[in-house]
Regions:
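Structural motif
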Residues: 1-2, 19-27
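Short amphipathic alpha-helical heptad-repeat segments
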Residues: 2-10
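A short linear-motif detector with a strong N-terminal bias
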Residues: 8-9, 16, 120
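Scaffold helices S1-S3 of the voltage-sensor/voltage-sensor-like domain
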Residues: 13, 17-20, 41, 47-48
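Accessory alpha-helical DNA-binding modules that contact the DNA backbone or grooves
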Residues: 29-160
């Protein structure tokens, strides 16, 4: 596994925990883990398990998680979160201006769980009822959703 792939696993866990309203320090620990792996100049997967703690910012707990990822390709906590977490919420982070905090707000206040829910809420002008969201953001999100839909449609017409 490449460092970026390993870091993405930690980022996924951090995003799901943050959207789910988990403890700030726990979320930050997973974000720091992703950063430590991403910033490491050589392949983490090529290190012997007993050398993981040589990576700046990696303690015994993170070293154990790294060993699990290298051995299994995933983290048990990520697998468990994916079982219970609405996958559509994670897909929303690919849209501009939507990070975990804003996605949590949308889920909590407007019960948005996926792109379709978001599109309906934007078209109804519901986002502007939330502080920090406005008409301009609604327009940009609608454009992003339309572009995404256009890309998907173009892909479908090209593929047999």
């Amino acid at each position: 596994m490449r460092n970026e792939e390993i870091a993405r696993l930690f980022d996924d866990v951090a995003d799901m925990l943050e959207i789910g309203g988990d403890n700030f320090f726990r979320v930050r620990a997973y974000r720091n883990a992703a950063r430590a792996v991403r910033d490491y100049p050589s392949s983490v997967a090529d290190l012997a398990h007993d050398r993981f703690q040589e990576i700046p910012g990696v303690g015994s707990d993170l070293a154990a998680k790294l060993a699990t990822i290298i051995d299994t390709g995933d983290l048990p906590i990520r697998i468990e979160l994916l079982r219970t977490f609405p996958l559509g919420l994670l897909e929303l982070k690919n849209l501009p201006m939507l990070g975990p905090k804003r996605i949590k707000l949308l889920a909590d206040r407007l019960h948005i769980r996926n792109r379709d829910d978001l599109k309906r809420a934007v078209e109804a002008g519901q986002l502007r009822t939330i502080r920090g969201f406005g008409a301009r953001m609604e327009e940009q999100l609608l454009e992003a959703l339309a572009r995404e839909l256009g890309v998907l449609c173009d892909t479908e017409t090209v593929l047999p």
